[in-house]
Each structure stands twice: as C-alpha cells, then as structure tokens.
C-alpha cells in the first residue's frame, strides 16, 4: 500500500469564528445593520437637518459648499505679466 496525503490536512488555517460566523458573506464582522439608521430605518440623528435645508425651511448653515479655486484669476495675472 502506498502512502498518500491525508485528506484531513488543510493547506491553510481556517478563519476564526469571529470572521466566518458573524454577518453576511463578504461583510466585515463589525458591519452595522442598515448603517446605523435604527429600528424601522427611520434615519440617523441629524438626517432631519438635511431635509429641512432641502425644503428651504432653514438656511444652509451646515451644508457649506466648498469654496471655489482662485486658479483662473491667477492665470489671468500671469498672462498679463508675461505679455508685457
């Protein structure tokens, strides 16, 4: 009888139970169901402020748009200097 490899040997160690038995396949083990929106998916704390801003009931205090770049004005300054 020839010697064969044991069928019980595994090539690598199995994942710990923390990773293999919690959550759905492909999710991180510390994944929060519904991204923390709560029971019934009512939303996260602070979501109502976005709704009020979108409806125009309050001014956009928390939703400041990013300030535009001054790149175009600088290009014009450099062009004027180089042309002279």
Curated annotation (Swiss-Prot):
Its main location: mitochondrion. Residues 1-18, 74-84 have a biased composition (Basic and acidic residues). The modification Phosphoserine is found at residues 28, 69. One of its GO terms (biological process) is cellular response to desiccation. Residues 1-84 are annotated as: Disordered. Keywords: Cytoplasm, Mitochondrion, Phosphoprotein. It is found in: Mitochondrion; Cytoplasm. The keyword Phosphoprotein applies. GO terms for cellular component: cytoplasm; mitochondrion. Found to stabilize, together with STF1, a complex of intrinsic ATPase inhibitor INH1 and proton-translocating ATPase (F(1)F(0)-ATPase) in mitochondrial membranes. Binds to the F0 part and may function to hold the ATPase inhibitor or STF1 on the F1 subunit. Also acts as a hydrophilins that enhances dry stress tolerance. Cell viability after desiccation and rehydration is due to the antioxidant capacity of the protein, which reduces the number of apoptotic cells during stress conditions by minimising the accumulation of reactive oxygen species (ROS) in the cells. Belongs to the STF2 family. Present with 5330 molecules/cell in log phase SD medium. This is ATPase-stabilizing factor 15 kDa protein. It comes from Saccharomyces cerevisiae (strain ATCC 204508 / S288c). The lineage of its organism: Eukaryota, Fungi, Dikarya, Ascomycota, Saccharomycotina.
């Amino acid at each position: 009888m020839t010697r064969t490899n044991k069928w019980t040997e595994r090539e690598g160690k199995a994942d710990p139970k923390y990773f293999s038995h919690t959550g759905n396949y492909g999710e991180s083990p510390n994944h929060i169901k519904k991204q923390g929106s709560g029971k019934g998916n009512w939303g996260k704390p602070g979501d109502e402020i976005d709704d009020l801003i979108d409806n125009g009931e309050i001014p956009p205090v928390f939703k400041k748009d990013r300030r535009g770049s001054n790149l175009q004005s600088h290009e014009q300054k450099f062009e004027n200097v180089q042309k002279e």
